[in-house]
């Protein structure tokens, strides 16, 4: 299960190298709580806001994409500021962090059920690669899986490849730096040279 956690974020279930499910929907707005995006909400919420607040589609779109998530919960749009406020004990941010972590753990749990188990968790992107605190809070919620975090390695890992679980941990956890540009370039090349999407899937 990959946890791509940055300003935007997604959780993805991968089995035998193939994506089984992802928290994103038609757009990256769906899924977990993000820096300024709301993540999954009741589909009626935007309609209710438009009706009761007399807002336009564009205004609600801006609210859901740029004024929600951790920013809406705690008042900070930058994850580093949000984390610092959490460590200071700001009540709104402490509650916001609980909501944020819960949304991530909920998707991980759902994907474990969908795949019938999990071998490894991967943390990547800005927060996933650099925040030992967020990784620790997530993994602590998953300790029932037999995950044993290596706190020393976890705290020291910032943007580098590392295994952050102890030797013998039943489920392993890794930090793996992302390279979205390279993946886009490779997929574009495959799309250009493959006769059909099915051929592209086999090539990967």
Predicted segments with their positions:
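Internal helix-turn-beta structural module
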Residues: 94, 98-114, 128-191
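Short glycine-rich phosphate-binding loop at a beta-alpha junction
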Residues: 118-126
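A mobile "lid/hinge" subdomain adjacent to the ATP/sugar-phosphate binding pocket shared
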Residues: 53-96
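Predominant activation on well-ordered alpha-helical scaffold segments within soluble catalytic domains
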Residues: 43-51, 58-65, 80-83, 105, ...
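Hydrophobic alpha-helical segments, chiefly the membrane-spanning helices
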Residues: 203-204
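Glycine-rich phosphate-binding loop of actin/hexokinase-like ATP-binding domains
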Residues: 1-51
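Conserved small/polar residues in nucleotide/adenosyl-binding loops
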Residues: 192-199
